[in-house]
Amino acid sequence: MASCGGAQPRLGPTVKREALLARLRSTPRWDVLVIGGGATGLGCAVDAAARGYATLLLEAHDFAKGTSSRSTKLIHGGVRYLAQGRIGLVREALEERAILLANAPHLVHPQRFVVPVYRQWDRLMLGVGLTAYDWLAGSRSLGASRLLSARDTVAALPGVKQEGLVGGIAYMDARFDDARLAITLMRSVFDLGGLAINYLPVSALRHEAGRVVGADARDAESGACFNIAARVVINAGGVWADTLRQLDEPQAPAQLAPSQGAHLVLDRDFLPTDSALLIPHTPDGRVLFAIPWKGKVLLGTTDTPRTDLPLEPRPLAGEIDFILDTANRYLTRPPRREDVRSAFAGLRPLIGSTKGGSTAALSREHVIQVSRQGLVSVAGGKWTTYRRMGEQIIDTAIPVGGLPARPCSTRELPLHGHPGSACEDVFGTDRPEVDTLPGAGRRIHPALTLTEAEVRHAIRHELARSVEDILARRHRALFIDARSAQDSAPAVAAILAEELGLDDTQVREQTEAFRQLAEGFLTPR
């Protein structure tokens, strides 16, 4: 693949887990300890490290293992939030969209959306709403929304139903690769002098004189224990944040009302266009998107209350039917279960109560709290505003930890691999170095773009430890085509064995574990 422009940084030596753990053990005290390696935690760690604080991030599983790799892949102001009158949330999100487009142009890209309209009244109302959306974006606008004729709508959305179509509306937002942004943020933490380690779960918080002063953690691979001292501890546990809060205050009431969002991935044939489709009205009061992503079409999402917190949530049968039925009302070629290449779900850490049975109206905003013992916890939030959340959380943490006050610098902080201008290669300026590794010209599977060199790069420089880490988050194979990802597992496991010294038993275990995981991404017929 051709590289993006810009300076070409050297990747440096292979990152050894043993060296990371040795650095952790040799550091007597950290300024900032962040627990949680999703969007929120990584945003906090980048912000803290950029201010010059000694920063440590610990993740119990892999970076973006949970919600942060299972989003609808949008960086957006939120058209439906505008309809709810949440002007401040939309304005902030549009500002953050502009910042992300500037700071990570290899991962975040402008995306045209088209809304097909079948009633003139809807065309009028949507036109007014999207004009307001343009106005809120101001100088950060990606292009003005405009009304389309029925003919232009069909040209933009080949495959959309034409019966009763009166026209459409086009507007601009942005799409991204969520897990790759997470990996890029992790690399940025290291670039800024911080430390981030996956598979190192926190088992307890450490208290002295009634204050949180650190945490105990245990390496999931070796079993080694670490007693970590920190001036301030940040709970960025996502949907599991309440569990961490209760390590500090066992009687702390639950604050979150998790909601599940399911997504389906289809071949591009169902919507052969670079424009995204927005379905403005669904029976549960949401919108449904069909987005071009990684050569496929991503359909989503749902809003289903969950009282449990599974590490591997699965789309429910009713959610799959809901998405397919809704899409079928708008597409001339109706997708069926057997057409689904991958089905996945994520849990949103919404703030509020589900006593009414629905989470669609609960807050997508975030709340920062400081406990009596000084644990800084954040609840809620979304990818679009991750940077702003990180800024606010570190601003809150500074006086709690008695840290010297330093200003935030992430508004104009290019993230790792920044190419200098827009490019579609997620590796950005790392690409030339990636392609010097063995196997740059050999694909792992004919249906995937993943090369042997990219697998080696994930292991050597992106802290990948398993087949899942590589096929789910360093590359998005599991989310794009679960069957092809499943078929690729043995080849990836063989490279892991070569790079990490795994024995035959470990290779078989890795392959079988991923096979079972991928089964959950395949839609039951």
Regions found by a protein language model. Give the residues of each.
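Extreme N-terminal leader/targeting segments of oxidoreductases
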Residues: 1-32, 47-51
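C-terminal accessory subdomains/tails of enzymes that are appended
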Residues: 20, 29, 61, 107, ...
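Core beta-strand elements of the Rossmann-like FAD/NAD(P) dinucleotide-binding domain
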Residues: 28-30, 222-232
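Short hydrophobic core segments
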Residues: 35, 228-238
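Glycine-rich Rossmann-fold phosphate-binding loop(s) that bind the pyrophosphate
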Residues: 37-38, 60
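Glycine-rich FAD pyrophosphate-binding loop
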Residues: 49-69
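Dinucleotide-binding Rossmann-like beta1-alpha1 core, especially the glycine-rich loop
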Residues: 73-156
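A conserved short coil-to-beta-strand element within the FAD-binding core of flavoproteins
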Residues: 198-213
